[in-house]
Amino acid sequence: MQQPSQPTRESTKKPVPFQHEEYPCQNQQRSSTLYVLICLAIFLSKFTNQLLASLLDLLIRIVTTLQQLLT
């Protein structure tokens, strides 16, 4: 009976085309994650600005009402 041969260094290496095919996917995933983060940051900044503007408007109304009540 023939014994199974030990895997040589050549047979254990990953095929080169597979590595090249794998890399663009990782790059695309990284760029899409970055795109999502940028969109999220823009959305949050607009939402925060709107919230701050509303709070400032409310504060101005409270101050004006207090001034009218005190005079």
UniProtKB/Swiss-Prot annotation:
Keyword hit for Transmembrane: yes
Q: State the Gene Ontology BP annotations.
A: killing of cells of another organism
Query: What is the protein's membrane topology class?
Result: Single-pass membrane protein
| Region of interest called Disordered, as start-end residue ranges on this chain | 1-24
Q: Which UniProt keywords apply?
A: Cytolysis, Host cell inner membrane, Host cell lysis by virus, Host cell membrane, Host cell outer membrane, Host membrane, Membrane, Transmembrane, Transmembrane helix, Viral release from host cell
What's the main place this protein lives?
host cell
Return the InterPro entries for the record: Phage_MS2_lysis (IPR022599)
Report the superkingdom from the record.
Viruses
Tell me any Pfam family this protein matches.
Phage_MS2_lysis
Q: Which residues cross the membrane?
A: 34-56
- Subcellular localization, per the record? Host cell inner membrane; Host cell outer membrane
Cellular component terms (Gene Ontology) = host cell plasma membrane; membrane
Looking at the keywords, is Iron-sulfur present?
A: no
* Task of the protein: Induces the formation of specific membrane adhesion sites between the inner and outer membranes, apparently leading to host cell lysis. Lysis may be performed via activation of host murein hydrolases.
Per the record, the similarity remark reads: Belongs to the Leviviricetes lysis protein family.
Q: What is this protein called?
A: Lysis protein
Where does this protein come from, organism-wise? Answer: Enterobacteria phage fr
Upper taxonomic lineage: Viruses, Riboviria, Orthornavirae, Lenarviricota, Leviviricetes
